[in-house]
Curated annotation (Swiss-Prot):
Residues 32-41 have a biased composition (Polar residues). Keywords: Initiation factor, Protein biosynthesis, RNA-binding, Translation regulation. This is Eukaryotic translation initiation factor 4E type 1B. MRNA binds at residues 81-82, 127-128, 182-187, 230-232. Transmembrane segments: none annotated. eIF4F is a multi-subunit complex, the composition of which varies with external and internal environmental conditions. It is composed of at least EIF4A, EIF4E and EIF4G. GO terms for molecular function: RNA 7-methylguanosine cap binding; translation initiation factor activity. Belongs to the eukaryotic initiation factor 4E family. GO terms for cellular component: eukaryotic translation initiation factor 4F complex. Recognizes and binds the 7-methylguanosine-containing mRNA cap during an early step in the initiation of protein synthesis and facilitates ribosome binding by inducing the unwinding of the mRNAs secondary structure. The keyword Ion transport does not apply. Residues 62-65, 98-102, 157-164 are annotated as: EIF4EBP1/2/3 binding. It comes from Homo sapiens (Human).
């Protein structure tokens, strides 16, 4: 049944070119070893996850710090909201993540009204979850024309920020991320668990904005779930901005 429900989330993915060798040096630790969850390492392991290497060689798995669950939402107004939300699978290694990403449809190919959500195992992608209700989200709103230009890159970078624990000690504040495919314009949001943790929230926002490669002139805002739950998205006020 689930396979039928989420069939829209299946599909292919384009190839990614390798970075220049000099960029690799920036990802190494002071001891000269490459950080296991650095952006370049995560990308370089993608090919291995897809090919598996020679049959006689056992693939070395690279565990993630957290287990992550991918959810798929397809809007059907005849059903309750929670009945439209489906757990696709869970991943806890870099190789599992790339295998999953390579076999689901790109966000830009989803129909309007659909969402992907990647959350830490045990946290559901809804405001009502006890680990979300005191938190909020950093929201990136895209113009309609950006769907086929920037959406997939921004969403993948968001996923890599999550599984790579890119926010250092403040990564523990991160609950997950959601991409909403909408007719008026798509949205990507990173959810954190405590809206009142100003230092943690701002650190996540600054790092996230930098990782997305957004212009310094581009402003993204953080909204508390308590505010957005009682108001429309357009009326919700930003608690913080970066």
């Amino acid at each position: 049944m689930l396979a039928v429900e989420v069939s829209e989330a299946e599909g292919g993915i384009r190839e990614w070119e390798e970075e220049e060798k000099e960029e690799e040096a920036a990802e190494r630790t002071p001891t000269g070893e490459k950080s296991p969850n650095s952006p370049r390492t995560l990308l370089s392991l993608r090919g291995k996850a897809r090919t598996g290497g020679p049959m006689e060689v056992k693939l070395e798995l690279h565990p993630l710090q957290n287990r992550w669950a991918l959810w798929f939402f397809k809007n059907d107004r005849s059903r309750a909201w929670q009945d439209n939300l489906h757990l696709v699978t869970k991943v806890d290694t870099v190789e599992d993540f790339w295998a999953l990403y390579s076999h689901i449809q790109l966000a830009s190919k989803l129909s309007s009204g659909c969402d992907y959500a990647l959350f830490k195992d045990g946290i559901q992608p809804m405001w009502e979850d006890s680990r979300n209700k005191r938190g909020g989200r950093w929201l990136v709103s895209l113009a309609k024309q950006q769907r086929h230009i920037e959406l997939d890159r921004l969403w993948l970078e968001t996923l890599l920020c999550l599984i790579g624990e890119s926010f250092e000690e403040h990564s523990r504040e991160v609950c997950g991320a959601v991409v909403n495919i909408r007719t008026k314009g798509d949205k990507i949001a990173v959810w954190t668990r405590e809206a009142e943790n100003q230092a943690g929230v701002l650190h996540v926002g600054r790092v996230y904005k930098e990782r997305l490669g957004l212009s310094p002139k581009t402003i993204i805002g953080y909204q508390a779930h308590a505010d957005t739950a009682t108001k429309s998205n357009s009326l919700a006020k930003n608690k913080f901005v970066v």
